[in-house]
Design a protein with these regions (language model features):
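Acidic/histidine-rich catalytic neighborhood of metal-dependent amide-processing enzymes
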Residues: 131-195
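Loop/turn elements at helix/coil->beta-strand transitions in domains of secreted/extracellular proteins
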Residues: 73-75, 105-109, 160-165
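Bacterial signal peptide processing site
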Residues: 15-18
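C-terminal motif of bacterial Sec signal peptides marking the signal peptidase cleavage site
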Residues: 10-13
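Active-site-proximal beta-strand/loop segments in catalytic clefts of secreted hydrolases
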Residues: 46, 80-82, 101-103, 112-116, ...
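Post-signal peptide N-terminal segment of mature Sec-exported envelope proteins
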Residues: 20-45
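A non-catalytic alpha/beta surface segment that caps or lines the substrate-entry region
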Residues: 44-104
Length: 195
């Protein structure tokens, strides 16, 4: 829901089409055409790497792909590397990816999603799947796909009068699984890359 609200704000602000006023004097909103097929392809490509579980080749390859897509669309990209500690003591090699449109602009829009996948399907109705990773198509990959599509649109029309920061958080999905006997509330084990 937050992504859709941000998407609407960006699309409305990106308008370059000439419009005429309505009967009450308000200008109709105009913006570039969001291409759902393009966003779908970006989501699919992430899933083709496999589950982007922390410390996996799929995770690292996907991160490199995300960086290259943002760079392809003219964004200024930086990465925040960190070694984080999971709830179970696992060292997690995390990389937040920040892609900026008009990085010198002082008025900015912030849009965020995460790209890592849950290593356990602990909410699956079938307990036989609890130890399997989640593909993360409708969670991490979809949000990142929308951000990449927005970056593509901004690369075609830079009339937006403010900057945009796209942040792809990492280590969001390593929270305590439901089947764990972990002591404590576990609330600080989620969204490690954003802490």
């Amino acid at each position: 829901m937050v992504i859709m609200a941000m998407l609407s704000a960006v699309l409305m602000a990106c308008g370059g089409n000439k419009t005429s006023a309505t009967a009450n004097g308000e200008q109709p909103l105009a913006g570039p055409d969001f291409n759902a097929d393009s966003a779908w392809a970006f989501c699919l490509r992430q899933c083709q790497f496999g589950p982007r579980v922390m410390n996996s080749a799929a995770h690292d390859s996907c991160a490199q792909w995300i960086v290259s897509r943002f760079q392809q669309y003219g964004m200024t990209v930086s990465q925040q590397h960190a070694t984080l500690k999971g709830y179970d003591g696992t060292s997690l090699n995390a990389t937040n990816i920040i892609a900026s449109f008009k990085p010198k602009a002082t008025n900015r829009i912030l849009i965020c999603a995460h790209y890592d996948c849950r290593p356990w399907a602990d909410n699956d109705a079938d307990s036989a799947n609890w130890q399997k990773p989640v593909m993360g198509a409708n969670d991490g990959a979809s949000g990142v796909a929308v951000m990449i599509e927005l970056a593509r649109l901004l690369s075609l029309n830079d009339s937006l009068d403010r900057g945009v920061d796209f942040v792809c958080f990492d280590a969001e999905d390593w929270g305590v699984p439901q089947w764990s006997d972990h002591q404590g509330d576990g609330s600080d084990t989620w969204a490690l890359g954003a802490q």
